[in-house]
């Protein structure tokens, strides 16, 4: 009987030790794997300067935004010290209200001065970049419809007053300091001049670079193709 007990102990204890080793190794491997979490605060707001970012207004939050497009800075193009390098010349003013239906879906309305546009918009966050790079970029879809109330003989019917815009917004946060956004855009205008086209494509890009925890440099640029 004693021999049988000794034999059982010899068999069981090494097995238990091996199982404990396997469990410990598995725990260490799981801890070493990067956790899959969404990358937060890629940009601080839903717009950089003139272009949209991947960000949306959070659920049940309201964003009221007044944007100004000033005049030319250079003296040769109408700017100069007499109008404070374009600041006195407001080329466009846009007042918008945006609301977060969910953390990924926002809607909005706006009024723009230049073409006397009334706008409706929607933006949806399709994908969020993850910390483990399983999803390397954030992707959002944006759509806007504008209706001009400008008094013009060119608008012979109301259908001419509509402009439609759709965007696919691609963004990546490369580090805690640098975030980049790239925006291909398609625009359809129901009414255009004789030498213009109804459908146009454009590319926009921009970045945010944080040089202190509370200060950043932001930049964006857009180019019409064709």
Regions of interest found by a model, annotated:
Residues 201-210:
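A contiguous pocket-lining binding segment that forms or flanks enzyme active sites
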């Amino acid at each position: 009987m004693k021999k049988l007990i000794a034999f059982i102990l010899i068999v069981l204890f090494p097995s238990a030790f091996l199982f404990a080793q396997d469990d410990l190794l598995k725990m260490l491997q799981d801890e070493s794997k990067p956790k899959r979490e969404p990358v937060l605060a890629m940009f601080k707001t839903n717009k950089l300067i003139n272009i949209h970012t991947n960000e949306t207004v959070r659920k049940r939050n309201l964003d009221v935004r007044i944007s100004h497009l000033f005049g030319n800075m250079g003296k040769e193009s109408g700017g100069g010290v007499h109008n404070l390098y374009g600041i006195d010349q407001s080329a466009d003013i846009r007042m918008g209200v945006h609301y977060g239906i969910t953390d990924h879906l926002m809607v909005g309305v706006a009024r723009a001065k230049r073409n006397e546009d009334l706008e409706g918009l929607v933006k949806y966050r399709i994908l969020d970049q993850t910390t483990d790079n399983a999803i390397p970029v954030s992707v959002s879809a944006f759509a806007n419809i504008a209706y001009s109330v400008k008094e013009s003989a060119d608008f012979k019917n109301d259908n001419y007053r509509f402009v439609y815009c759709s965007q696919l917004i691609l963004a990546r946060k490369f580090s805690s300091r640098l975030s980049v956004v790239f925006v291909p855009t398609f625009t359809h205008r129901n009414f255009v001049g004789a030498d213009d086209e109804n459908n146009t494509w454009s590319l926009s890009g921009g970045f945010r670079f944080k040089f202190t925890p509370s200060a950043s440099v932001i930049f964006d640029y857009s180019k019409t193709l064709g």
